[in-house]
Amino acid sequence: MREIGLEEMQQIELDILLAFDALCKKYALRYYIDGGTLLGAMCYEGFIPWDDDIDVKMPRPDYERFILLAKELPAHIHLELPSKENCEYLFAKLADARTLLIENPGADEKCSGIYVDIFPMDGYPDDEQKRTAHLHNLSKFNTLFHTSLMRFSTMKESDNRSTRLKGMVYDKIYTPYRLFKKLEKLAKAYPYEECSCVGLLIEGNPQKECFPKSWLEPAVHLEFEGHRFPAPCGYSAHLRNFYGNHITNKEYHHNLPVILPDHKHKVYWIDGEDEPCSK
């Protein structure tokens, strides 16, 4: 297998984004570039030079419709969703099946193709008390989900009998997929279209992710690697809300946890699938 470098990886991700964008345009689905991708569009008109992923987010109704339509994407682009067999993430990914991406090579490695992350956005209750309770519940189950991926298995191997028994019980009750379904149900409790504040509830930091829907709509289009993609109309306020007031300082970008330049990935073309990317 031939190893794929950062620049080629970015081009493959861009090709996935272009296919996704074409399908969203065809069916009038709303989406917005997000995270490091949005910051890159604002400050670099493309990838932050060392960034190795693309993030987009969609209102929940569009996200669920997209899942039904994803079969129309090119054959080599596969939709990956949380399932009983594989539930390491809480959101959708579009992966290039011609490639192999190994995250954290070694004991805790995870394998997929080169991918683009697609996050669903949900509504927040307007009432402050309800919002606090809602976020508390989400945070509790999010912590349980991430604990279920590793810690319960470790507990089962403990020398301490009590810890070992707890690990066995928790591993049966709190399976990752069961916790994902609980989180998804919680996140959808306040419908996106009926709320004035929205955000990414199922993953990340829902407290910081909360913002007025007016920051999103109507979308504006920003330059990214020679193409224009939809972004929140209040993208500057949105980025400052999430990353702080230093977003235009390019030196500061090296310190942002979601786009650190030391991601531990190994990426390859699968034998016989080595094809040049479109430019």
Regions found by a protein language model. Give the residues of each.
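Short, His- and charge-rich active-site/binding loops that engage polyanionic ligands
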Residues: 135-139
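Conserved catalytic core of two-metal-ion nucleotidyltransferases
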Residues: 1-25, 67-126, 144-244, 249-279
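Active-site nucleotide-donor binding segment shared across nucleotidyl transfer reactions
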Residues: 21-54, 58, 63, 214, ...
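A short secondary-structure junction signal
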Residues: 128-133
